[in-house]
From Swiss-Prot:
Keywords: ATP-binding, Magnesium, Nucleotide-binding, Transferase, tRNA processing. It comes from the Bacteria. Its cofactor is Mg(2+). Its EC number is 2.5.1.75. The record marks S100, R121 as: Interaction with substrate tRNA. The lineage of its organism: Bacteria, Bacillati, Actinomycetota, Actinomycetes, Mycobacteriales. GO terms for molecular function: ATP binding; tRNA dimethylallyltransferase activity. InterPro entries: Dimethylallyltransferase, IPT, P-loop_NTPase. Substrate binds at T11, A12, T13, G14, K15, S16. Belongs to the IPP transferase family. This is tRNA dimethylallyltransferase. Monomer.
Length: 313
């Protein structure tokens, strides 16, 4: 069966454009690996490729959740693995694209996750809504100091997950960490990155464009559909900052600060992505700067040649 290709790397490096070019050349189908692009309606703030720009190519794992639902790596893994197996069985090439670190790792490698229980999780999510993330994190610290030490006091999603696992297993959270198995499909993993100064400029321009294209209106609409109740979606970079600005009155100053904080939060996230992906020796890193001269077409040609050689096709 066909060998998948994964296009990974930090935010704003041009992964989506490269994935489109690869899928078109190989007759492939695109599989999203960006956690926030799983959500319907979260389009501008996640830089989701508009349907009119998808070149008629099949896209999977986009717009599969309401903003009130919680995205989990385990659920994503189950659905995405089945999707890729189906694509391969039909003789097509899966082109995986995204920058959500654990989602990509759990997809490309055989991770086994501890049990989950929607009712238990819902109870802890309700507790989070009642007392706030700081107080809930303090409860985690009382139950499992080691877990609290590695989870940020502002990370409500991971705090809830830790408390859920502790309740279900009766063990410390660390004892229930995912078991990492072997690679699934011998995927060709391509990483795209830029020099830091240039990537910062791309992030700034993307952030400005988001706000110019109606990002605030998107958040306002999603709030009317329950975004505030979404444990995962409401904490996405950009969305959380705009929600706070709207709560502060939505004035020009508050929204300008939301824009600045979105930029800062994205840069911070890029550092985490680089650290995570940089540890994977399988990644073939390509310089995003080459897009400036040859466009995604030039990079795609190089990747396709490498893929054909390694796949003996």
């Amino acid at each position: 069966m066909t060998r998948p290709i994964a296009v990974i790397g930090p935010t704003a490096t041009g992964k989506s454009a490269l994935a489109l070019e690869l899928a078109e050349r190989l007759g492939g189908e695109i599989v999203n690996a960006d956690a926030m692009q799983l959500y319907r309606g979260m389009d501008i703030g996640t830089a989701k490729v508009p349907e009119c720009e998808r070149r008629g190519l099949v896209h999977h794992m986009l717009d599969v959740l309401d903003v009130t639902e919680t995205a989990t790596v385990a659920t994503y893994q189950e659905r995405a693995v089945a999707t890729i197996d189906d694509i391969r069985a039909r003789g097509h090439v899966p082109v995986i694209v995204g920058g959500s670190m654990m989602y990509i790792q759990a997809l490309l490698d055989d991770w086994a996750f501890p049990a989950t229980d929607p009712q238990v999780r819902a109870r802890w999510e309700e507790r989070l809504a009642q007392i706030g993330v700081t107080a809930l994190h303090a409860e985690l610290a009382a139950r499992d100091p080691a877990a609290a030490a590695i989870i940020l006091p502002t990370d409500g999603r991971r705090t809830v997950r830790a408390l859920e696992v502790i309740e279900l297993t009766g063990q410390p959270f660390a004892a229930s960490a995912p078991t990492i198995g072997p690679p699934r499909w011998d995927t060709l993993i391509v990483g795209l990155d830029w020099e830091t100064e240039k990537l910062d400029d791309r992030i700034a321009r993307r952030t400005d464009l988001m706000f110019e294209q109606g990002f605030v209106g998107e958040v306002e609409y999603l709030l009317s559909t329950g975004l505030r109740d979404g444990v995962t979606a409401s904490r996405a970079i950009g969305y959380a900052q705009v929600i706070a600005a709207l709560d502060a009155g939505g004035g020009a100053g508050a929204l300008a600060q939301a824009r600045d904080l979105t930029f800062v939060g994205t840069r911070r996230y890029v550092r985490r992505q680089r650290s995570w992906f940089g540890r994977d020796h399988r990644v073939v890193w390509l310089a995003g700067e080459s897009v400036e001269t040859g466009g995604p077409e030039g990079l795609a040609g190089e990747i396709v040649s490498r893929w054909r050689l390694s796949s003996n096709t």
